[in-house]
Amino acid sequence: MDNSYKIKVQHVTKEYDLYKSQAEKLRSFFSLSNSKVPHFWSLMGISLEVKAGETLGLIGVNGSGKSTLSNIISGIIPQTTGTVEVRGDTSIIAIGAGLRGNLTGLENIRLKALMQGLTNPEIDALMDDIVSFADIGDFLYQPVKSYSSGMKSRLGFSIAVHVNPDILIIDEALSVGDDTFYQKCVDKISEFKDEGKTIVFVSHSLKQIEILCDRVAWIHYGTLKEIGATETVVKHYREFTKWFKGQSKKEKKHFQRQMKANQKAFDIDAYQQQVIEERQANDPNDQNVAAEVKKDFYGSVISEKMSWGNRFLTIAVGIVFVLACLINVSGHSLGDVLQNPGNIVHPETVLHDTNATSGVK
Ligand SMILES: Nc1ncnc2c1ncn2[C@@H]1O[C@H](COP(=O)(O)OP(=O)(O)OP(=O)(O)O)[C@@H](O)[C@H]1O
């Protein structure tokens, strides 16, 4: 087994249905076709590896798919196709993930640490360090929903680095703090690096990327544009942003519209076919390529969309439930309703024997 990587992402895509409203989502559930709902492919086939002990930076313009990818790696959201392999006895902590708004900072520390597998005595031993690193004062006793984004980031970062994960996913956590906190975080990340931990670091700050990352992946409107040495990829990305800034307002808009249009028009079947052809070209003797690629695409994915069978079953159960309620309310027996379905909307009339109730003979 190849032990050189800690994270391996293969053919990962992410599709979103762009419903205009909840009502449209509901309508599409009951309709036989959802082809009218526009789709958007946030990721269009990403394959990359993060080696054990390396810090991989993710860069790219706004909306390019960095957070989508880091959330998929963290297991926060599922991919639409592809495999995500996280190697070994590994725990991942994503800074922004898992803070519950209704719980206080203190409660969140305990919850996140418990979820990370720590025992209560272990958490008690760490509590002072986590609290002192986060440095958010009395806000610790307030619900997290009252925190500023900087405070959330401080708390999330502090918990993440103290529960000792093998892999740390840091998504834009350093962009919201002040300089002192930023330096504390950089020192902590450097400590992690020295301990040989694996880090995925998402940032718009090329300076931070240059300081912290061994390699960089440039995500560009849902595709992996380039991956390699930090210096090289950052240089190319700087050239791109310089070129983009040099465009007129109209040209910029046109470029962005074109990129988004590509993401809407992405054809997953064509992409799958392309992967099959590439593999066949590499290994012409392999007769099972199509089945292998299908397994790689869909084998480890739980579909977020309901199959027609399940949809039919859900609707049928719903109808049976409503009928059962109506029969119950109508007072008729099931046999009566089956013989005369109209009874269901005509409640049974109960005739009272007035003589019996009044006791008159
Ligand atoms: N739940 C969702 N429904 C529909 N589209 C979504 C959803 N989440 C993300 N997207 C879209 O996916 C694309 C990628 O978003 P993502 O947040 O991953 O980008 P990013 O590179 O992290 O951006 P930024 O640098 O601004 O944080 C964007 O176009 C975004 O609008």
Swiss-Prot record:
E.C. no: 7.5.2.4
PROSITE patterns tied to this protein: ABC_TRANSPORTER_1, ABC_TRANSPORTER_2, TAGH
Keywords, alphabetical: ATP-binding, Cell membrane, Membrane, Nucleotide-binding, Translocase, Transport
Keyword Cell membrane recorded: yes
Annotated segments matching region Unknown: 247-361
The organism's place on the tree of life at top rank: Bacteria
Disulfide pairings: none
Membrane topology: Peripheral membrane protein
GO cellular component entries: plasma membrane
Localization, UniProt: Cell membrane
Broad enzyme group: translocase
Reactions catalysed, as given in the entry: ATP + H2O + teichoic acidSide 1 = ADP + phosphate + teichoic acidSide 2
Recorded GO MF terms: ABC-type teichoic acid transporter activity; ATP binding; ATP hydrolysis activity
Positions with a binding annotation for ATP: 60-67
Pfam families, sorted: ABC_tran (PF00005)
Family: Belongs to the ABC transporter superfamily. Teichoic acids exporter (TC 3.A.1.104.1) family.
Functional note: Part of the ABC transporter complex TagGH involved in teichoic acids export. Responsible for energy coupling to the transport system.
Quaternary organization: The complex is composed of two ATP-binding proteins (TagH) and two transmembrane proteins (TagG).
Name assigned to this protein: Teichoic acids export ATP-binding protein TagH
The organism of origin for this protein: Levilactobacillus brevis (strain ATCC 367 / BCRC 12310 / CIP 105137 / JCM 1170 / LMG 11437 / NCIMB 947 / NCTC 947) (Lactobacillus brevis)
